[in-house]
């Protein structure tokens, strides 16, 4: 009963805050799975649940990029992602998903903070600070970084790492054999859970945990037995990593991704002290202030509070907290040094690990130490004289000045974080009254409880009880205040769904049903209004489609591209994601874009309408603002924005004779480099149903495939066809050496037309094709893809 009484204030605080968070989520629906990355993350999970196989690290579908590998953020061990598969309406699923993510984060932060040595009160305050400042819906109040609105799966990774760090720190601390075995097993299970939920992002999330955990362990000077148990836990993870083939999985993905930087590491500069000094002196680090110590950015003040708290912990504490505080200060400092090299472009392929990931990795520790200076008595900051000697006046003055400076800095931090909520809102008398009434209610409740407990003799000091109550009430009260001024958000509604409905009926894919062709969205932008945005953007020409989303959403209530189509299972040629392939970019930029077009590696897009090329890659429908298409395209409908007379109508055209796996070339032209292949495709583009360009010599044939059916299946496709002899089918899917015929059918897969798949067979075939790349697989296939790219000159 006494334990429940002690826990009750904490439970009430969390219950009230959780209820207000859910209310906020209902009023701020666009804070959950925010466009564009958040929408994409949600679609990615839902598509994997529908088209993927459990625990497949290379989930494959024809929904985007002509059979591209999904970004491997997998739902199978991620409860927040699995919630998106619940039979609820769309908004309810999002709320449940985020509620699960928030619960994971809160529990794991408390667990890690307690394992380091923080009190229950400070651990709870740290968890509530994290959830309130950085997690939807109240993250919109502060706009520090919309990370969890865009990439909510990171919450699961953070929770797994928090719990894993706590298990690792506890492992071997006692001689209890069952306990140590259980902790080693928990550490391995959490490692596997994080790794299999998001293989790449998980690795990016680990640096702070590695550095700070190592500092804590070294600071303890543990006995050999503890070292042995910790080494065993780490060894188990290494055995799983290397034994499951994950090393070649990472190397293969890096070798084929368009996102991998191609510039070499600038070792001459990295190893030069003079180059570093010049960089520190002349490079404006705060040109990208996000998450760095740049005071014009609101998030910098959270970092400042954490650094002050870490310094306070070093002076006033001993043990793990002191070691963790020192490690956090060193880590943030080194992260800023890394930021200089990252922004200067010195890191080459290692630049895929951006500075933002390094800071995001230590957010849990930042929030733990950010609460320290607010709850640590300032008197403990005063310097202690040795022995019983009295402190000199200088030391007294130094302690007083230090206390005042810390207090002023904390006030500035609070003001800077709380001012201008939601960017353009203001606090008024109503918010002041809400805060005062809520605080008064807390004080009244405390006095009432103390009076009741006083009768039974079980009562804490008034100061302790009131302090605990105020700390636990801070964030629920702030939530009440911020909800009172939160702007209401309305989700855009589609004004005329005729085009998307037509595509859903005639082009959507389902497991076990035939493939019916891709859709491509191509903006001509006749008046130069669709892609209006900053000129010096890394998006380059892809800004036409990036800014086009908002342009069409404001006028039509839909974007006519990407997740708006993928959510309806409408497959597209274009792709948005981190791992769009080098070969697909090479094809699109050389054959479906004007000369000199430059785009961002995350965007696979079409910039020119070439019906012959588009047919060959399987495009059947084109959404465009162009008025007409040549070569007999049939108009299937159009929509207009009545309230925007200058906005172009969006039209839907259907191309005749698209390649639905129905192109059966009989003649083959050999070409060895990408430029040569592109030239041969251009020369023969009017007969790509008869001619294919290959790198390996293939003899001509007279037999053509007939009765071809290409069926969508989980993690792959099935092709059935017949012929009168040796024949070939040009499949509208990206080629990879990882495509495997898994049912023993006599079919051979090779590369054609730079990045398409050519299937060769004799007389009859029923081939089940899967993309095999992941756990316990021969992942060297992806490395061979990378070697192909080099041989092609990509």
What are these regions (language model features)?
Residues 185, 688-794:
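Active-site-proximal, structured, solvent-exposed surfaces of multi-pass membrane proteins
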Residues 128, 152-155, 159, 171-175, ...:
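Contiguous transmembrane helix-bundle modules in multi-pass membrane proteins
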Residues 230-315, 338-347, 351-356, 360, ...:
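Periplasmic/ER-lumenal interhelical loops and adjacent helix-loop junctions
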Residues 18-61, 240-279, 529:
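Aromatic-rich transmembrane-lumenal/periplasmic boundary elements in polytopic membrane proteins
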Residues 617-679:
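Aromatic/acidic, Gly/Pro-rich catalytic loop(s) in extracytoplasmic/lumenal soluble domains
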Residues 19-162, 290-294, 564, 568-569:
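Active-site lumenal/periplasmic loops and adjacent helix-entry segments of GT-C-fold
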Residues 14-20, 98-116, 120-175, 179-218, ...:
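Membrane-embedded helix bundles of polyisoprenyl
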Residues 51-53, 58, 70-73, 475-496, ...:
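Extracytoplasmic/lumenal acceptor-recognition loop(s) of multi-pass membrane glycoenzymes
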């Amino acid at each position: 009963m006494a334990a429940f009484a002690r826990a009750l204030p904490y439970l009430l605080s969390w219950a009230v805050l959780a209820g207000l968070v859910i209310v906020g989520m209902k009023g701020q629906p666009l804070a959950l799975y925010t466009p564009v990355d958040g929408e994409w993350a949600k679609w990615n999970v839902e598509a994997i649940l529908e088209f993927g196989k459990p625990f497949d690290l290379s989930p494959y579908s024809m929904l985007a990029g002509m059979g591209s590998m999904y970004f491997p953020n997998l739902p199978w061990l991620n409860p927040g992602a699995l919630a998106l598969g619940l039979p609820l309406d769309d908004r309810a699923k999002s709320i449940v998903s985020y509620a699960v993510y928030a619960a994971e984060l809160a529990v794991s932060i408390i667990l890690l903070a307690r394992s380091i040595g923080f009190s229950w009160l400070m651990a709870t305050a740290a968890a509530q600070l994290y959830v309130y400042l950085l997690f939807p819906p109240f993250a919109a109040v502060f706009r520090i970084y919309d990370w969890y609105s865009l990439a909510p799966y990171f919450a699961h990774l953070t929770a797994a790492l928090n719990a894993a760090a706590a298990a690792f720190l506890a492992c071997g601390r006692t001689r209890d054999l069952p306990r140590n075995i259980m902790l080693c097993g928990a550490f391995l299970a959490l490692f596997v859970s994080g790794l299999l939920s998001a293989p790449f992002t998980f690795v990016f999330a680990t640096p702070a945990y590695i550095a700070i955990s190592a500092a804590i362990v070294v600071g303890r000077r543990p006995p050999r037995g503890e070292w042995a148990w910790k080494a065993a836990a780490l060894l188990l993870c290494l055995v799983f990593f290397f034994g499951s083939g994950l090393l070649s999985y990472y190397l293969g993905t890096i070798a084929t991704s368009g996102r991998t930087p191609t510039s070499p590491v600038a070792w001459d500069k990295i190893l030069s002290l003079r180059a570093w000094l010049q960089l520190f002196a002349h490079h404006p680090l705060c040109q990208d202030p996000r998450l760095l110590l740049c005071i014009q950015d609101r998030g910098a003040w959270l970092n400042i509070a954490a650094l002050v708290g870490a310094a306070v912990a070093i002076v006033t504490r001993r043990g793990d907290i002191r070691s963790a505080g020192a490690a956090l200060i060193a880590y943030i400092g080194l992260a800023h040094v890394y930021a200089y090299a990252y922004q200067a472009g010195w890191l080459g392929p290692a630049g895929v690990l951006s500075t933002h990931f390094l800071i995001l990795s230590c957010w849990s520790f930042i929030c733990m130490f950010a609460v320290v200076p607010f709850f640590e008595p300032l008197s403990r900051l005063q310097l202690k004289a040795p022995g019983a000697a009295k402190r000199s006046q200088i030391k007294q003055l130094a302690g007083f000045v230090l206390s005042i400076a810390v207090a002023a800095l904390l006030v500035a931090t609070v003001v800077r974080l709380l001012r201008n909520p939601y960017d353009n809102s203001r606090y008024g008398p109503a918010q002041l009254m809400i805060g005062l009434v809520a605080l008064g209610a807390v004080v009244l409740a405390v006095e009432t409880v103390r009076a009741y407990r006083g009768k039974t003799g079980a009562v804490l000091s008034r100061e302790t009880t009131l302090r605990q109550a105020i700390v636990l009430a801070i964030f629920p009260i702030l939530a009440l205040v911020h909800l009172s001024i939160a702007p209401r958000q309305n989700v855009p509604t589609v004004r005329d769904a005729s085009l998307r409905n037509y595509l859903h009926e005639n082009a959507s894919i389902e497991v076990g049903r035939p493939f019916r062709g891709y859709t491509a969205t191509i903006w001509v932008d006749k008046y130069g209004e669709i892609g209006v945005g900053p000129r010096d953007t890394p998006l380059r020409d892809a800004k036409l489609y990036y800014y086009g989303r908002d342009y069409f959403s404001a006028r039509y209530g839909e974007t006519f591209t990407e997740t708006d189509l993928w959510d309806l299972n409408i497959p597209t040629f274009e792709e948005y994601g981190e791992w769009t392939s080098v070969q697909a970019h090479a094809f699109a930029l050389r054959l479906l874009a004007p000369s000199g077009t430059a785009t961002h590696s995350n965007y696979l897009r079409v910039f020119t309408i070439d019906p012959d090329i588009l047919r060959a890659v399987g495009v059947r429908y084109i959404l465009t603002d162009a008025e007409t298409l040549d070569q007999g395209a049939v108009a299937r409908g159009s929509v207009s924005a009545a309230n925007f007379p200058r906005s172009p109508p969006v039209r839907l055209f259907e191309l005749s004779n698209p390649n639905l796996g129905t192109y059966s070339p009989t003649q083959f032209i050999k070409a060895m480099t990408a430029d040569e292949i592109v030239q041969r495709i251009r020369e023969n583009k009017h007969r790509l149903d008869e001619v294919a360009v290959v790198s390996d010599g293939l003899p001509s044939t007279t037999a053509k495939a007939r009765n071809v059916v290409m069926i969508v299946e989980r993690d792959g496709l099935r092709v059935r066809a017949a012929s009168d002899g040796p024949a070939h089918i040009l499949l509208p899917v990206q080629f990879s050496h990882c495509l495997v015929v898994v049912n023993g059918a006599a079919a051979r897969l090779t590369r054609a037309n730079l990045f398409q798949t050519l299937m060769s067979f004799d007389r009859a075939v029923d081939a089940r094709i899967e993309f095999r790349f992941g756990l316990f697989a021969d992942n060297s296939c992806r490395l061979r893809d990378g070697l192909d790219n080099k041989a092609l000159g990509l």
